């Protein structure tokens, strides 16, 4: 290994997304103080982000699935997977093994990069946006529904003629909704202001 190769390896591994730095430098100490715990391991942290797009047109038109897959890959910065039906449902004309959507799971640096783009770029592009309802699942995980994936600047409207809805799940290590809400607020998630 030459000296230049060693230098590039060091700088590549030293890269840290802005939101990850913010978590370590400001959010974590604030959480420890507010929760009254001393160990950083006891504080909640973001573990992964799961993004899912359901494509009902995939039954008749496989191109719709390819478009959704390409769009989700562009949004997430990581290859997406095709999700298939686990069982047959005759009312929906669905057979086991049919493609029904695409999904991607983000961890590490990509997770923080996506969350930063989502909060700072995509959310302000939502029409009449007043903030999200804090819809947690009882175990500190936040679920958000997005009506149009066009809010992401990576999507080309010419190549993607149909607007797809998305489900985004922020999986945290929080034990309850109160701790999960606290973590997401400190990370900058825009929640609706409660009417007092």
Language model regions located:
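Ribosome-associated RNA-binding proteins
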Residues: 1-196
């Amino acid at each position: 290994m030459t000296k230049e190769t060693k230098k590039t390896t060091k700088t590549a591994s030293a890269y840290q997304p802005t939101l990850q730095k913010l978590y370590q430098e400001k959010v974590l100490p604030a959480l420890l103080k507010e929760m009254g715990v001393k160990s950083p391991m006891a504080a909640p942290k973001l573990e992964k982000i799961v993004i899912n797009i359901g494509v009902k047109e995939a039954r008749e038109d496989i191109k719709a699935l390819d478009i959704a897959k390409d769009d989700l890959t562009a949004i997430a910065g990581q290859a997406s997977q095709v999700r298939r039906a686990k069982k047959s449902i005759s009312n929906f004309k669905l057979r086991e093994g049919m493609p029904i959507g695409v999904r991607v799971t983000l961890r590490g640096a990509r997770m923080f990069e996506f969350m930063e783009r989502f909060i700072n770029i995509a959310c302000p592009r939502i029409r009449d946006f007043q903030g999200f309802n804090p819809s947690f699942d009882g175990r500190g995980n936040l679920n958000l529904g997005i009506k149009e994936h066009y809010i992401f600047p990576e999507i080309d409207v010419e190549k993607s003629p149909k607007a797809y809805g998305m489900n985004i799940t922020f999986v945290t290590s929080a034990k309850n909704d109160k701790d999960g809400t606290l973590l997401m607020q400190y990370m900058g998630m825009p929640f609706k202001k409660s009417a007092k």
